[in-house]
C-alpha cells in the first residue's frame, strides 16, 4: 500500500466531503513543481486558485515568515504591531487608495466589502430603508452566507436558506441589464473583472468601463473583486486595468499572502472606509504581524521579478500555442495573461485526470472548462512542456 493511498484513506475517513480533489497527495513544492510522497514530480498549473502567483515556497517570502515568526506572530488588534503599517503602506501605494482594512481570507474580505457598502449607503449616501447591492450571474465571491446569497449556483445555496436579502443579480456582461437594475437604493456593484470559477469568462469590451461610469452617475460604489484575477494573474497588476478603470474599492486576497500565509483586505478612499468606528468590524487575526510581514515580501516579489509583465508575455505565447490545437471538441480557448480556460464540449474532469498521469496538475471549473493558471514564475520552456502534455491529451487520437 502506498503512502499516497494511506494519506487519502485517512483524509477521506475523517474529513467532511466538501471537496472532490484529484487523487494525488502533495508533500513538497518549489516554484512550479510539486512532489508526492513517492517522489513523483508534477507541474502545478492551478497555483491554489491563483494564491501561489509567486511560486511555491519562494525563498524571500519564506525568509520573511521565518524572521517574523522568531519575533512576534499575533497581538490582536487590541494593540499596534510594527508590521501592519508597512503592509498598509504597500497596499495603498499599489492601489492608489487612502485606507486599508485587513482580514484573513478572501471570503472575509468580501463580507467586509458588503458591510462597508451597506454602512456607506446609510451614513454617506443617505439611502433610506434597505440598501441593495448588484452582483452578476456566474459570480464566485466565496462560501460565507453573504457570498452564497449573491451566488447563482443552486448547489452553493442548497440547504443553507434563508438566504440574506439585499442582493440583485444581473447577467454578467449585460450593461443594459445593469443600468436597468440601478435604483435609488443601490449601494454598490460588486464584480469580478474576469470570472474565474465561471470558466475564465471575460466580459465584452467596454462593459466594465461603462459600468464604472454608471456607478459614478448614480453615486454607486464600484467594487472590484480581484481576489483571483488580481496581483499579476491577468498580465496586469489588476484585471480591471484592462479597461483602464479605477474602482472605488478593491477586494484582495489569495496571492496577497504569496501562498504562504492567509491575508486579505479591502482598499478604498477615506470617505468610504471611515464609516467604520471601533467595535463596528474586526478580526482577531486580521492584520497580524506574521501575515503583514509575509504580504510585504509577497508584493515585493511580484514587483521585483516583474511578474505581471511576465504573465502578460508568457500568457500571450501560451494561448497562441493552445489555440493551435485542432480538435472540434475544443469550443474555446480564452484568457488574459496566465489566467486561461480551455472550454470543451464535454466534461473536463477526465482530461484533468489524464493530464495528471502526464505530470501536469490542473482542475476543471464549471464542468466543461480546464483552468490553466500556473505560478507566474513559470518559464517558457516549462510552458512548452505543459503544452506537449495538453496537446497529447486533447489530440483526437487520444480521445478516441
Swiss-Prot record:
Keywords: Amino-acid biosynthesis, Aminotransferase, Cytoplasm, Proline biosynthesis, Pyridoxal phosphate, Transferase
Compartment list: Cytoplasm
GO molecular function: identical protein binding; ornithine aminotransferase activity; pyridoxal phosphate binding
EC numbers: 2.6.1.13
Cofactor list: pyridoxal 5'-phosphate
GO CC annotation: cytoplasm
Pathway of action: Amino-acid biosynthesis; L-proline biosynthesis; L-glutamate 5-semialdehyde from L-ornithine: step 1/1
InterPro entries, per the entry: Aminotrans_3 (IPR005814), Aminotrans_3_PPA_site (IPR049704), Class-III_PLP-dep_AT (IPR050103), Orn_aminotrans (IPR010164), Ornith_aminotrans_bact (IPR034757), PyrdxlP-dep_Trfase (IPR015424), PyrdxlP-dep_Trfase_major (IPR015421), PyrdxlP-dep_Trfase_small (IPR015422)
Main subcellular location: cytoplasm
Keyword Nuclease listed: no
Record keyword Glycosyltransferase present: no
Sites of N6-(pyridoxal phosphate)lysine modification: 254
Catalytic activity reported: a 2-oxocarboxylate + L-ornithine = L-glutamate 5-semialdehyde + an L-alpha-amino acid
GO terms for biological process, alphabetical: L-proline biosynthetic process
Lineage: superkingdom: Bacteria
Gene3D superfamilies per the UniProt record, alphabetical: Aspartate Aminotransferase, domain 1, Type I PLP-dependent aspartate aminotransferase-like (Major domain)
Function: Catalyzes the interconversion of ornithine to glutamate semialdehyde.
Family in the record: Belongs to the class-III pyridoxal-phosphate-dependent aminotransferase family. OAT subfamily.
Protein name per Swiss-Prot or TrEMBL: Ornithine aminotransferase
Organism: Exiguobacterium sp. (strain ATCC BAA-1283 / AT1b)
Lineage: Bacteria, Bacillati, Bacillota, Bacilli, Bacillales
